[in-house]
Amino acid sequence: MCTLLTSGSDFVWNSLRDFAGSTGIAGFFAEMGWGNVAMICVAFFLLYLAIRHKFEPLLLFTIAFGMLLTNLPDANLYHTELFEGGHVHWDIFVANAGLLDYLYLGVKLGIYPCLIFVGVGAMTDFGPLIANPKSFLLGAAAQIGIFTTFLGAYALGFTPAQAGSIGIIGGADGPTAIYLTSMLSPELLGPIAVAAYSYMALVPVIQPPIMRALTTKKERAIRMQTLRPVSKLERILFPIVITVIIALLLPSAAPLIGCLMLGNLMKECGVVDRLSKTVQNELMNIVVIFLGLTVGATATAEAFLNFRTLGILVLGVIAFGLGTAGGVLLAKFMNLFSKEGNKINPLIGSAGVSAVPMAARVSQVEGQKEDPGNYLLMHAMGPNVAGVVGSAVAAGILLSFLG
């Protein structure tokens, strides 16, 4: 009888021990268990920022939840080994892939960012840019942060591909940053995506001190002439002409620019309203969910918890600041050759980063601090949407040289 009880208790004890070892909780006591705990805390913090403070909630929310899922031990939703070396290992993919591995193919193959650009194009009004083509120059000047940070990151020991991925943070364009990084340095995708969207949310905090430091009260109070009306023909021709010119001169930028202008042409032509509304709403929302979850899934403890991530965060904010300064300084330079009454308020130069429409709103707010009756929003939207085009072109340039 005693032997029977002993064997029975041993069986129960062994069963409980085996069950405990098979749970995810046991994974927290493994070699990198502390890293999983740390990343789960980061995920909770990002969820807090997205929900409580509304920091880029549409993407930061899903990125944070993807980060949470991938760092739960033994969940087996995402496997970094399937994408090692920047390639999809199809020979072992089907047998080992989890849910997020399949969804990540949309990032790896460059599908999700391009689909988001279709939606962005359908929601973008290029009218202020068409009415004032000089805005193209301000949008281009704001991309200086991308290339200067690329050089700085390379000098600090990052590979050229990694440096290019870090530099693109300065464009303040999340989908472009994700697209370029997935092509050049997929191992940095998590930190770069978090940095890009965090700094986009912090536009009203980062930009104003730089704008005030580089301008005088008199410059901030400049009133600009009213923009001319833009005809429907101009609005229809613009996306077609831009697509042809950029795709011919820089083929590597064709996917992003082509999708951006496709969406805009849907909006402006007026004959495919159903398609335009679909890409603005249903398609955009679905892709944002998949993109955020899978980008967050790449933020594993091994990829995120290192000094390289800290360097990315620091270089990212420097890139963003340099882009802001570049636009403001070019506007001041252009004023040296502008007649009185036709000068540019330098504050709109900071909107050349492609955080639409937040950067343009910051220009408006800062301008009204000096002159409450000064309305810069529509003027700032020109450089702002030019920055969307500019960041895509910058990504194409980096991809053509580093890809």
Region spans (language model):
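Short, strongly hydrophobic alpha-helical membrane anchors
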Residues: 1-32
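Hydrophobic transmembrane alpha-helices of secondary-active transporters
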Residues: 46, 69, 104-130, 263-266, ...
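Interfacial helix-loop-helix linkers and transmembrane-helix boundary segments
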Residues: 51-60, 78-79, 102-103, 123-138, ...
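Alpha-helical membrane segments and immediately flanking helix-loop junctions
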Residues: 108-109, 117-123, 138-148, 152, ...
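Entry/N-cap segments of selected transmembrane alpha helices
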Residues: 129-150, 301-328, 380-384
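Alpha-helical transmembrane segments
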Residues: 187-205, 313-323, 346-351
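Membrane-embedded hairpin module used as a gating/binding unit in multi-pass transport
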Residues: 198-271
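Transmembrane helical segments that form the transport core of multi-pass membrane transport proteins
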Residues: 243-331
